[in-house]
Curated annotation (Swiss-Prot):
UniProt domain HTH tetR-type: residue ranges: 3-63
Gene coding for it: tetR
Entry keyword annotation includes DNA-binding: yes
BP GO terms, sorted: negative regulation of DNA-templated transcription; response to antibiotic
Cited SUPFAM superfamilies: Homeodomain-like, Tetracyclin repressor-like, C-terminal domain
List of residues binding Mg(2+): H100
Annotated function: TetR is the repressor of the tetracycline resistance element; its N-terminal region forms a helix-turn-helix structure and binds DNA. Binding of tetracycline to TetR reduces the repressor affinity for the tetracycline resistance gene (tetA) promoter operator sites.
GO molecular function: DNA-binding transcription factor activity; metal ion binding; transcription cis-regulatory region binding
Pfam families, per database record: TetR_C_1, TetR_N
Coiled-coil residue windows: none
Lineage of source species: Bacteria, Pseudomonadati, Pseudomonadota, Gammaproteobacteria, Enterobacterales
Official protein name in the record: Tetracycline repressor protein class C
Residue ranges of DNA binding: 26-45
Domain of life the protein comes from: Bacteria
Organism: Escherichia coli
This protein's record includes keyword Transcription regulation: yes
Length: 219
């Protein structure tokens, strides 16, 4: 298979993923849809895990449009824009969060991660805090999408309103709180959670004055 054919395999696999989900995505089914023998896929993907890694990379390449800082970004707008863009990329495909979880980043993703770290360090974060900040937001985003996609699949299977079903067993305070969450929907829940994380990071960031003081000490 040449490069073009490899890209065709990935494109077809993403289409199949949307049709049958991660569990139904097998190399046998993929080969059938492509009209080739199953061993032909092993030229590029030695197993399903390698295929999933390629799909995860493709999801980000196609849909993650704010993966690196823009000229008009400050650290807050970048973290928010990056997380929202990452979330959209995962939501663009059925089981997108499950596909992404546990994958190994390819070289292009590592380069982008390095650019993100450099940007946050220049904004006043220590290398450690910048790393943990990116990890925390990434984990939060993947977890939020994982829960959303699982909840949507569960609601479709059950064919019932989860809030109505469980409301009678909830304490009054929890019932009111969950009503806010369900009425706001997953978008509002994600944005609020992200705002709380970014607000917390503000407390850990060095100010411009702090940076200048450290520079003077080093000199």
């Amino acid at each position: 298979m040449n490069k073009l054919q490899r890209e065709a395999v990935i494109r077809t696999a993403l289409e199949l993923l949307n049709d049958v989900g991660m569990e139904g995505l097998t190399t046998r089914r993929l080969a059938e849809r492509l009209g080739v023998q199953q061993p032909a896929l092993y030229w590029h993907f030695k197993n399903k895990r390698a295929l999933l890694d390629a799909l995860a990379e493709a999801m980000l390449t196609i849909n993650h449009t704010h993966s690196t800082p823009r000229d008009d970004d400050d650290w807050r707008s970048f973290l928010k824009g990056n997380a929202c863009s990452f979330r959209r990329a995962l939501l663009a495909y059925r089981d997108g969060a499950r596909i992404h979880a546990g994958t190994r980043p390819a070289a292009p993703q590592m380069e982008k991660a390095d650019a993100q770290l450099r940007f946050l360090c220049d904004a006043g974060f220590s290398a450690g805090d910048a790393t943990y900040a990116l990890m925390a937001i990434s984990y939060f985003t993947v977890g939020a999408v994982l829960e959303q996609q699982a909840s949507e699949a569960d609601a479709e299977e059950r064919g019932e309103d989860q809030l109505t079903t469980s409301a009678s067993t909830m304490p009054a305070r929890l019932q009111s709180a969950m009503k806010i969450v369900y009425e706001g929907g997953p978008d509002a829940a994600f944005e609020r959670g992200l705002a709380l994380i970014i607000g917390g990071l503000e407390k850990m960031r060095l100010t411009t004055n702090d940076i200048e003081v450290l520079k003077n000490v080093d000199e």
